[in-house]
Structure formats: C-alpha cells, structure tokens
C-alpha cells in the first residue's frame, strides 16, 4: 500500500510552512519518513522483497540529502523537524 491521499494531506497540513505549501523540505522529509516507516514494516514480513528494499534505500538517501540541505540553510527548522519526527541526527 502506497501513501494514500488522505494520509498525505494530513502530513502536508501538519508540516506546511504557508497555505499552499506542498514542496518545502519539511513536507518532503515528513512524507518520505512516513513512506520509509511503512516500507520498513513491510520488509520485516517480506524479507526477500529486494525491489522494495532498493526503493527504501533510495528514499533514505533522498531524505538524508534533504535533511542536510535543511541543516545547512536553517538549523532551527532542522532541529524542530528532527524532534517532531523523532529522527536521529
């Protein structure tokens, strides 16, 4: 199951910076985190699903790059997001 539109809208609503925000780093990182958490659970039960594992690793790398960008540009927003999502940094 991919991220359904209702769940995606909830995430966007929680992390948006302004009214029509869908592409800020915070929103992108939050959506990726939700997808990563889902895929992690999926891979615990389907250990041989290598296609999904590769997709998971790509998402983790993309999230890492977005987090590095946010940390480089605005450290306060980075710290707030990391604590809200419960990520290690």
UniProtKB/Swiss-Prot annotation:
Biological processes per GO annotation: translation
Keyword rRNA-binding: yes
SMART domains named in the record: Ribosomal_S15
Family: Belongs to the universal ribosomal protein uS15 family.
Pfam families cross-referenced by the UniProt entry: Ribosomal_S15
Organism taxonomic ancestry: Bacteria, Bacillati, Bacillota, Clostridia, Eubacteriales
Record's subunit section: Part of the 30S ribosomal subunit. Forms a bridge to the 50S subunit in the 70S ribosome, contacting the 23S rRNA.
UniProt-listed Gene3D superfamilies: 6.10.250.3130, S15/NS1, RNA-binding
Official protein name in the record: Small ribosomal subunit protein uS15
GO CC terms: cytosolic small ribosomal subunit
An MF annotation (GO) of this entry: structural constituent of ribosome
Keywords of the record: Ribonucleoprotein, Ribosomal protein, RNA-binding, rRNA-binding
NCBIfam families assigned: S15_bact
Record's function text: One of the primary rRNA binding proteins, it binds directly to 16S rRNA where it helps nucleate assembly of the platform of the 30S subunit by binding and bridging several RNA helices of the 16S rRNA.
InterPro entries: Ribosomal_uS15, Ribosomal_uS15_bac-type, uS15_NS1_RNA-bd_sf
Gene name, Swiss-Prot/TrEMBL: rpsO
PANTHER family per record: RIBOSOMAL PROTEIN S15, BACTERIAL AND ORGANELLAR, SMALL RIBOSOMAL SUBUNIT PROTEIN US15M
């Amino acid at each position: 199951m991919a991220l359904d539109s209702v769940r995606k809208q909830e995430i966007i609503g929680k992390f948006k910076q302004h009214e029509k925000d869908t592409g800020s780093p915070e929103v992108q990182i939050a959506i990726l985190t939700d997808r990563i958490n889902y895929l992690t659970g999926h891979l615990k039960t389907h250990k041989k699903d290598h296609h999904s594992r590769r997709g998971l690793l790509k998402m983790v790398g993309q999230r890492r790059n977005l987090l590095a960008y946010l940390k480089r540009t605005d450290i306060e927003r980075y710290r707030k997001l990391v604590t809200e999502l419960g990520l290690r940094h």
